[in-house]
Amino acid sequence: MFTYIDPSIRKRLEEQGKLFQIDGDGARVAAAHAVTRGPAISLLGPIPLPLKLGELELQVDWYACVRRTELGKLEEIADELRAQQGQALFATLASSMAVNSVLIVGDPERWQDPLVRVHSSCLTGDVFGSQRCECGPQLASALQKIREDEQGGMVIYMSGHEGRGIGLWAKAATYLLQDGGEDTYQANRSLGLPDDSRDFSDAGSLLKFFVRGQPFRLLTNNPKKVHDLEKMGITGITRVKHVTGVTDANRRYLSAKQGWGHKLSREDLDAQ
C-alpha cells in the first residue's frame, strides 16, 4: 500500500528513517514540525536500484520526492475514501501527484565536487527514444558520466517538467505546430504558453539537502538553469557542457535552443 493510503506503513517508514521531510533550504525537519522556509518535500529512500540502459549498467540509490502540500492533501482525501470504502478511486487520486526522483551514485557524505544532472521528464525522448529532441541520450550520457566520475554524483529527475513545463498534451500540439514550420518556442507562444514554465525550486531544495553546500558540476547547456538555481541561494555551480544525441531529426530544434540562449556552437549542431 502507498504511504498516503495506509498510515501504519507511513509510521513504520518514518521510524526506519526511510520517509522523511526537508524544507526549502534542504534542512531535514521532523514530520510534526512546521516548515519555515519554502515548501516541504517528502522523500522516500534510499531504495537500491540496479539500472541497465543499453550497454550501461550501474547501481544507484533512488529517492522518490513529492511536495508535502500535495501529499498532505492526498492523505486527507485518502482517509475519507478509506472510511467510505472508496478504494477504487485510489488510482485516480495517485495519478494527480507529481513525484520527482533522485538517483544517487556514490556516497554523498564523501562528495566534494559531485557531477549533477537536473533532468526534465520527457516521455517521448526518455521512454520512446524519440529523436525530435536529445533528452534520452542526455539522460543516458549523464548517468554514464556520473558513474565513471571519481566523485560520483546524482540525477534529479523532474517529473512535472514535460515539454518545458506545459505538459504532454500541449507538447503534442506544439509538435504539430512545429511540423507546420514553427520552432519549439514559437509553438508554445501560439498556444498562449510561456517559452519555459519549469519550476526548479524543488530541485534546488534537493540539491541543498544532498550536496550540503559543496561545490558541484552541473551537466547542462542552459545558462538559465544555472541562474534559476543561483537565485535560490545555491552557490559553487560549475556548468559542464552536455552535448549528445544530435541528429538530422532534431538539428532545427537544437538551433532554436541555441537562439534562445543555450550554449551550443556551430560544431555542436553539425555533429552526428
Where are these regions (language model features)?
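Catalytic domains of riboflavin
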Residues: 1-272
